Amino acid sequence: MNTHGFFRRLWPPRSEKKTPPCWPVPSAKQPITDTPLVVFDLETTGLNQRKDQVISIGAVKILPAGLPMRSSFYELLNIPLDKYPRDGQLIHGLTQHDLQQGKDPATALESFLHYAQNHLWFAFHAEFDRHMLSRAVQQYLGVHYDPAPIDIALLAPLLNPGHNGLIYLDDWLNHFGLDNSTRHNALGDALATAELLLILKQQALRAGYHSWAEVLLAAQRHQKLGQQQNTALLMF
């Protein structure tokens, strides 16, 4: 009796784990002046981080020399229709027909990650986009990936003392007199956010910061101090 074949049928060999693709992200400890950046924005079917889906991705690169206007990324994702309203209502100006013209989600996501690799990631109110992107990559590519984007909404109050009341992206765009007329899709939002980040980058350099890690640490401390001060005021 071929016992080897018998036991192989009972316990088939485990399939080898697929090595996940590598989309490297540079260290935030590198000098600000030498670090290429990517600003991204997602549009989703809603704000439920467990159930809603990513429907479009927009991104813009910022190189050490500045903002190359032609280096942008935008894709619609052809997600299953049961994840999208069937009554023809618009979400972010998109219809079911628009969505059906989009790319296969796995293809779109892989293209985006390839586009963004070797760049330090940024987003405005980044935590939501971070979670939604990581979940989509897990769902469609079967790998865990977290580029840990830096939250621009956290950096702006640090570099602009006395303007803690500015919360939303439009608030900051209006504050700096930046044009927000392009904000009609994920790419428009990413472009507007990139223009804001360029201003913050110059402010960080003038303030004496050498790396984005230093700016982020100072911003986290600034936020914590503000929260403590607000708590103290509520106690009186």
Regions picked out by a protein language model, each given a short descriptive name:
Residues N2-S27, L198-F236:
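Acidic two-metal-ion nuclease catalytic site recognized across multiple nuclease folds
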Residues R9-S134, Q138, D146, N174-H184, ...:
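Conserved non-catalytic scaffold segment of RNase H-like nuclease domains
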Residues S134, A194-K201:
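Short, amphipathic alpha-helical segments that act as regulatory/interfacial helices
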Residues Q139, L158, H175, I199-Q203:
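Active-site catalytic microenvironments for nucleophilic, acid-base chemistry
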Residues V143-I150:
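Short hydrophobic/aromatic-enriched beta-strand-loop microsegments
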Residues I150-N164:
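Short alpha-helix plus adjacent loop in nuclease-associated cores
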Residues H163-D179:
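A polyampholytic, Gly/Pro-enriched intrinsically disordered region
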Residues N185-L196:
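Acidic, divalent-metal-coordinating active-site segment for phosphoryl/phosphodiester hydrolysis
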